[in-house]
Swiss-Prot record:
Its EC number is 3.1.-.-. Probably forms a complex with the antitoxin HicB 1 which inhibits the mRNA interferase activity. It comes from Pseudomonas fluorescens (strain Pf0-1). Keywords: Endonuclease, Hydrolase, Nuclease, RNA-binding, Stress response, Toxin-antitoxin system. This is Probable mRNA interferase HicA. It is an enzyme of class 3 (hydrolase). Belongs to the HicA mRNA interferase family. It comes from the Bacteria. GO terms for molecular function: endonuclease activity; mRNA binding. Signal peptide: none annotated. The keyword Kinase does not apply. The keyword Transcription regulation does not apply. InterPro entries: HicA_mRNA_interferase, HicA_sf.
Length: 60
């Protein structure tokens, strides 16, 4: 999955994005937050994707 596709999926789940440094965003949902690196069209590692989903308390 590409970073841009995952970003769209997160937005569809109701995740709020706040600006961070460079290409990174602070994302939050229901009091849980983490950092999302957005590198556009590059492929995202599966471990990073699963980690962000887990940290936000979302289901795959």
């Amino acid at each position: 999955m590409k970073y841009s596709e995952f970003r769209r999926w997160l937005k569809a789940q109701g995740v709020e994005f706040q600006t961070g440094k460079g290409s990174h965003f602070k994302v939050s949902l229901n009091g849980k937050s983490t950092v999302f690196p957005d590198h556009g069209a590059k492929e995202m590692g599966e471990g990073l994707r699963k980690s962000i989903v887990k940290q936000l308390g979302l289901k795959d």
